[in-house]
Amino acid sequence: LRPEIYGNIADEKVELNGLLYVIERLPIGIEECRFINLTSEEGYAKSHFKANVPPKRRRNCYRIDEDQMNVVITRGRSDIYDILTHLTFIFIESHKIKNRVLLDEAGEVSHDWKKLEIAVQQNKKLTQVEKEKAISHTANILGRTFEEILDIYDAFGSATTPDRFLHVIYWLGKLAIEEMVENNKRTITFSPVLRERLGHHIHGEIWATNIKEVLKENNLLGRPIHVISANMHSVMNSIFAVPALKTKFKNQSDFFIYEELSKSGANEVRDLVEAIALKQGMISLPDTSGTNIDVQIFDTAKIDWSKTSFPKAQLGEEKPVLIVMDYAFGEQAYETIDELFKPYKKETFLNAQSISIMGKAGILEGGKGDIMIPNAHINEGTADNYFFENELTADMFEGNDIAVFAGPMVTVLGTSLQNRDLLQFFHESTWRAI
């Protein structure tokens, strides 16, 4: 397979964008670790070990010592596929680095490698001159131009570790060289408890029970329930943001206001909208179960609809309850919905009326930001799929200056395994996937 995300994985030169994508989804320091141990939730949160959460994937990881990283798996097999494909990628890239710098089996290395090692071992922020010298040597090692490396250099860094790019390249290469010269193999293990618990819905059950208990405490269990899978700000903003911020953003469109709220420094306006929502029946449930899925519950009876974006909303006799859940991860979507719809304490059935899923997906027809309406599903092979009829149709979304496509949807086991040729086949063959 040549997964699309990983770019030039099959070429001799090191793939930079793919490496950035993967490094952002793995814990900081993993490039230094020879032993990766996948565990379930086994009590590390109660220890002196500090949780190390990757910037782009919410999963707890713990650096046990200089050689070992533990990664906590709470989201089922999709999480394991995700991690294994990312680790496979960095291992492949590390061997490319090794092949370019190792001159013989005795461990003699190239001049460029020695210079990179000196730069990394300084353990201080490099001056502009030192940085550019190190980039020049690294460009030779990676088979890339000076400019290509300069362009991506800062994306790897942070305020505390601006030169992390060099550090990542050095340690990937170093471990691959030691594998070759000293036969110190990198090892991925699964803890016995993780093997035992996989597929048992442990975290999903705790998560769902917690939601049902909050519904019961607030006398909402018997009301009609609509489940919405979306970002935590989406539903809250669509109901409360525009009226709340109309005076601040005079004569601006609704979409302008939503964009302002999404900006990274917009905490003040976001807090304002959230404060209004909390006063009008929103209950916020940050996750404590290990699923990493936060939840908001909206009691529509407590909302003053005249002061919302939907002043003409007609709610009927029994005012419904909205349960907004953050995006699930792969197989976890089945686990959480399966557990949520189980009766509370065996005798109280939930009055579930609808599930709405706002999701991101790769589009085969059209472009980024277009709307896709799946009308059939081609599944990637595990039995854990929850089937339902899609009541949305393309014509409901026409006329908003956004392109809309309807057709079959292909699901793949882990984002990281999307392959252009395979997807092209599904798009162009009789499957006609979008």
What do these predicted regions represent?
Residues 148-164, 171, 177-184, 189:
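Long non-globular sequence segments
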Residues 175-221, 330-333, 343:
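N-terminal glycine-/serine-/threonine-rich phosphate-binding loop
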Residues 223-231, 321-328:
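Short, hydrophobic/proline-enriched secondary-structure or compact coil segments at domain edges
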